[in-house]
Amino acid sequence: MTEPTYIPLRLHTEFSITDGMVRIKKLIAKAQEYGLPALGISDLMNEFGLVKFYKACRSAGIKPIGAADVRIGNPDAPDKPFRAMLIIRNDAGYLRLSELLTAAYVGKDRNVHHAELNPEWLENGDNSGLICLSGAHYGEVGVNLLNGNEDAARAAALKYAAWFPDAFYLELQRLPERPEWEACVSGSVKLAEELGLPVVATHPTQFMSRDDFNAHEARVCIAGGWVLTDKKRPRDFTPSQFFIPPETMAERFSDLPEALENTVEIAKRCNLHITLGKNFLPLFPTPDGLSLDDYLVKLSNEGLQERMVQLYPDEAERAAKMPEYQERLDFELNIIIQMKFPGYFLIVQDFINWAKTHGCPVGPGRGSGAGSLVAYSLKITDLDPLKYALLFERFLNPERVSMPDFDVDFCQANRGRVIEYVREKYGAEAVSQIVTFGTMSSKAVIRDVGRVLELPFTLCDKLSKLIPLEANKPLGLDDAMKAEPQIQELIEAEEADELITLAKKLEDLTRGLGMHAGGVLIAPGKISDYSPVYQADESASPVSMYDKGDVEDVGLVKFDFLGLRNLTIIEMAQNNIKNTTGDIVDVGTIPLDDQTAYQIFRDANTTAVFQFESTGMKKMLKTAHTTKFEELIAFVSLYRPGPMDNIPDFVARMKGQEFQYIHPLLEGILAPTYGIMVYQEQVMQAAQIIGGYSLGGADLLRRAMGKKKPEEMVKHREIFAEGAAKQGISREKSDEIFNYMEKFAGYGFNKSHAAAYALISYQTAWLKAHYPAEFMAATMSSELDNTDQLKHFYDDCRANGIEFLPPDINESDYRFTPYPDMKIRYALGAIKGTGEAAVESITSARQSGGKFTGLLDFCERVGKEHMNRRTLEALIRGGAFDSIEPNRAMLLANIDLAMNNADQKAANANQGGLFDMMEDAIEPVRLIDAPMWSESEKLAEEKTVIGFYLSGHPFGPYAQEVRQIAPQKLSKLKPQDSVRLAGFVTAVRTMMGKRGKIAFVSLEDLSGQVEIMVGGQTLENCADCLKADQVLIIESKVSRDDYGGGDGLRILANQVMTLQTARERYARSLSLALAPHHDIGELVQLLAAHQLPDTPRIPLQLSYANEKASGRLQVPPKWTVTPSSALFGELETLLGSRSVRVNW
């Protein structure tokens, strides 16, 4: 093989995040095409892509060179750091670069404004494992050369040469578009000759081909928040910065061949080695000098004894059961010790038991770990695996060596405390979370590129929304354009070809950084010895620079600390129960055969019940009539794509329909699921019983079936048939059983996971059945910021007979508060514009000084630090002051006066002396009067901060009236060809369907809400009247929504009328309810103005009421009026909507 002439060293991949769009897979393919024996990448201040690059190079037979393009602090211009490239020479260099990058993000003396290396770190540290390139025109040497300061350039070169003895190169770059760089090249060559330093040529690669330049500019603008036409935006890159072949570099540096030769020399000096496939567990301290093996055995046996007392209180029964449990425990312990995983189990049980004893609720289990009796004995899980036939081999297979993986659910509110405990136990430097990479999906990239191209938002939004979803993920742009022709039509109509061209180039490129939902790394020492650490800002948690797959490859062990909202709900509900009733409830000890709890499932009353909230699940429950826990486990497993097809058969068999097992030998394992394979564990057990597999081997078979690898399936089919033949089973029957297993292995569910989650489902249902107000208050408190969910739960509460008390500054807390007799006080924290700190200041003032007496008193006592004008307005609009002053308009009018008064009193109090003596002489503040809002105004204002109507409903004043012609309640709708509906419009949205424009109208009455489709000619006829915040009467057709699943309804409008139009068409008389405050003279004038000649008129009916009496007034026959929208509107403005009623 000929000696290479040039090795690329400087290259930004997509993992530079703010620039660079080189994808590693394409890079390696092009490097092979160029015949490169070695290749380097140097992402900006990170090593996010290093492991992926390393593995790809090794697979392609290319020597990987790891490096980072680093910023180095510039004390003379802190906002303009210098640049250099640090290349890994050996293992020491790998650790050193990781250490430096970690210090730049999480070190105590880091730059908090942007990540950079402190020059002192380089001066004082051991850099012997690194090679440094000067950074060309961006480096300290190059900047000074371009500024004409040769002395400073010389001093910098000597400084770096001292930091990196025999490993510092002056870097040379040439681009056709950058002739000004030549001064840096010539100056560097001159310095090199003078100081005896080597030079090296690099090409600053940012993208793969020249025609990627515009897309790369768009990528830089997306990251920086600029638009492409902005003349002030940075233009740091040129079209020449693509991945050029060695021949181009040879031409470009033909006058400096040694600069090219040194790229090869550097490649030879570098030997990057990353250890892959070896696990590094943290050291777990054990007492009394016990080994990890002995300590695990000790804790497991002690824990089993404790569990057995709980499971079998009767001593004789416990003694009879103990041998079975002890045998299973010993079996598991032997495998765990044989596979060298005692340390893993001990670490997990330690932080879980710390959480349980420090007020941090932990889930009963998650994933296959619930199948381990050792885990149950150590209190890692809380479900007896023997009782529910859960298999250890599904979790830890002795025939397939891989790390065990406990996914642990913690109460969301306390999860951080457990992670902090781990930090304290193992050291902060040994613990971090895991980075994730956000990419530009097809929908997102359309919006991003559209913004930098300054295209109309409506166009980009429309295009983005046209992209279809598949399995809840948007299709790629190419597939989307094939599936949805409207995309291409819209692009052509709007001349948006450039948008699609750039979007396709950027699609799926790494765009941003995130944090893995639950993964926590614990290392045997510093995390940075295995992966550099990144931290977005002061408030963020440190994360590894390697993602989940990469950290596992380098041997770091991931522990999953997942936050589960439902555990927080259960904990809050238990506290609520204690506060309201005095009962001490521990859902971990409730019986699993409580039929009151199962009635919740039978009634499909499962809103807020974990895993059973969806419409489709409720539909299944209505037909199932479940009575036992095993059925809940099956439902959790069945209600998913694929297994859902078996639900009708499963339910029918539950109810007594006869069925046959596929083979009598499988009756024992299939009986709990009525002959249907539901769980992965059943596939494994069938392989064991029929095919003679060990459970470990059966797990390998299950995995092979799931992956559908033909060559493996042929092999396993023969093994299975041989085992079946030993049982006297024919080849035809064994193939039938094998095919049946293969079908279910593809989508069978992990029973251990289903059982653990079914337990949480049952616990939440039990709480809802026995303590509904306490449970629902906790549920709503977990969703304070989610208005849609709060409305959903509010409606469910009302349907279950729970009464809501309004928010009240003298009664409410931050969260929802349950009261005896099925009442819940609305939470101040659920009012938009408040916050926990603001509410804390209210409750604190209330506790120390008693109830508030008015707005002035409130403002004087509640600290201004957290109670700003916006928060005060929100509380007033939400009705939180109604108990001390029901006139919300008047309170709003006096906010400035009240806050200024509070400020003045605080200032006077600080002065003391004379002001104290004058306090009594100061004239009291008088509040400004203001007319009360009408009912509709009050509700509209209330909705802006509550999110829905709480103290009333805008449909209320009209309900009795419109029920005369539209008696159907929305909550009681059933399929029917024609029905007249009435309600208040809360929202209208439109979209383009295949047959044209469609409007979706959200309609509410006092019983519930529906969505009505309006299209075609009907939409054309009523387009002007489809607006929110009005009453509509709609002639509709109601049918079953088979497409949507569950028992949803599809409602199609045939005719739409506003209330005013309906009144004009159907009114027979007009009733007006008068009160002392009404202006009768103005009323008479108004009515007279609507006695139009030559028009149909309707008679008036008047009533009058004051504090002493009420009665009907006789109206002369001549007082008839012409019904019209104008008349009804004016009357409602004058008298109020509740005083005007049309009789139909």
UniProtKB/Swiss-Prot annotation:
Enzyme class: transferase
GO biological process, one term: DNA replication
Cellular location(s): Cytoplasm
InterPro entries registered for this protein in UniProt: DNA_pol3_alpha_NTPase_dom (IPR011708), DNA_pol3_alpha_thumb_dom (IPR041931), DNA_pol3_finger (IPR040982), DNA_pol_IIIA_C (IPR048472), DnaE2/DnaE/PolC (IPR004805), DNAPol_HHH (IPR029460), NA-bd_OB-fold (IPR012340), NA-bd_OB_tRNA (IPR004365)
Keyword line: Cytoplasm, DNA replication, DNA-directed DNA polymerase, Nucleotidyltransferase, Transferase
Keyword check for Transferase: yes
GO cellular component: cytoplasm
Function: DNA polymerase III is a complex, multichain enzyme responsible for most of the replicative synthesis in bacteria. This DNA polymerase also exhibits 3' to 5' exonuclease activity. The alpha chain is the DNA polymerase.
Protein's UniProt name: DNA polymerase III subunit alpha
Source lineage: Bacteria, Pseudomonadati, Pseudomonadota, Betaproteobacteria, Neisseriales
